[in-house]
């Protein structure tokens, strides 16, 4: 487990699938994910099995509250490209349906994963695709971690009867 003061990151385990499914099915969360359909436990199991087969490019973690030892969220470095040393950053706090919060728990979990990506995996870039209406997450990563806007993908999401842009943000490893 990658440990901080309040939270830790451990690889996703099969017993996490129920709570991960429940969190991902929260409608306010789901609209911010690329997978917009309601997920079943069978869907989660297929995802988990695929994750096991692609461990060399997908590092997915359950965020654990170190005091209670209970899962509070999920985070990952996904689709790692080992040639250009980049990874897609995935993150949410499911506990209390926070999604993301400008609190020490969210900040510590993100910092742990960024540090792991840069210091242990020797990544050069960590990036995210976020929908333009997800201002909470966009502002969190830009303001708290100095992510920069890289690109705009026009009309890349359909939600609430209209098209929305995607914003690509990233953080470079400035060794």
Question: What are the residue ranges of the model-derived segments?
Answer:
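A short, well-structured alpha-helix characteristic of acyl/acetyltransferase catalytic modules
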Residues: 1-45, 175
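Acetyl-CoA-dependent GNAT
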Residues: 42-98, 172
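Short hydrophobic/aromatic beta-strand or adjacent loop that forms the aromatic wall/cage
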Residues: 58, 164-168
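Conserved acetyl-CoA-binding loop-helix of GNAT-fold acetyltransferases
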Residues: 101-116, 139
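Beta-rich extracellular carbohydrate-active architectures
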Residues: 118, 146-147
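Long, contiguous binding/interaction regions
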Residues: 121
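Conserved catalytic-core motifs of GNAT/GCN5-like acyltransferases
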Residues: 127-130, 147-163
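Conserved active-site tyrosine of GNAT-family acetyltransferases
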Residues: 140-143, 169
